Amino acid sequence: MIDTVLFDMGGTLEDIWVDDESRHSSIQGVLDILRAHGIDLNMDFETTAQSINAGWERYGAYRDPRQRELKPEEIWGSFVLTDFGLNEDSVRPYAEELAHMWEITHYHRTLRPHVKEMLEGLKGLGMKLGVISNTASLYQVFDVLKDYGIRDYFQDVTLSSVTGYRKPDPNIFLVSLHQVQSDPASCAYVGDTLSRDVIGPIRMGFGATFHIDSYLTKLKDTNVPADVKPTYSVKDIYAVSYTHLT
């Protein structure tokens, strides 16, 4: 019997996408934060953007094979801003400011239609609810959930930036399961990527998995084994609330 439903954040509870406007705004955001802290890079915008993007690629090359998440000062001080002579100690005072800004600026984010109605329906069934999210910011997910007006629906919010583990690593799921005090077999997981949100819960023995497409799905779901299938595929997240889970 399913008594707990856990959700991915970006691409699942919210629509998320990147375009030229958001790419430009996020680079400008980095420059603005650095200048506010007395650091002027004295470099043209295009070269700055190339260096920052190369830094993110370096971090991705470290992070993805290990399924690990570093803290903001490590990400920005040891990967993203190293071309500018900055390091963990120098960026530590404003690393989370950079991380938070990047998450809400590099990505356009809007709450998916029918999320509140779906959460209300699950609450009405007595379900425990939680979020498990890969994120490079310590606080952004909490703040955005509050901005959407849905923070209070969730008994737990587990983040890779806090645990140090990224989906599909089993440890991030285990942290959430301990927080909500549920067994894997009694949990359903809802996400937009097979490579993280379906493979991870299947390996953990979750009772059900839901998959919903997003902008990120094709970007992240490369080289996924053909036999990896969710229990349910949905087009409208509201379907989670009326699928027969019990």
State each model region's role.
Residues Q67-E74, R92-P93, H100-L129:
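Short, acidic loop-to-helix structural element flanking the phosphoryl-transfer center
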Residues Y232-D236:
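Short acidic-hydrophobic, aromatic-tinged amphipathic segments that line or gate anion-handling sites
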Residues A188-K229:
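Acidic, Mg2+-coordinating phosphoryl-transfer loop and its flanking beta/alpha structural elements
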Residues F45-A99:
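A metal-dependent, Asp-based hydrolase signature
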Residues M1-A49:
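Active-site neighborhood of HAD-like aspartate-dependent phosphohydrolases
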Residues R166-V198:
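Conserved Lys-Pro-Asp/Glu-containing loop-to-beta segment of HAD-superfamily phosphomonoesterases
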Residues T243-T246:
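Conserved small/polar residues in nucleotide/adenosyl-binding loops
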Residues K123-G130, T135-T158:
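Substrate-recognition/cap helix-loop segment adjacent to the acidic, metal-dependent catalytic center
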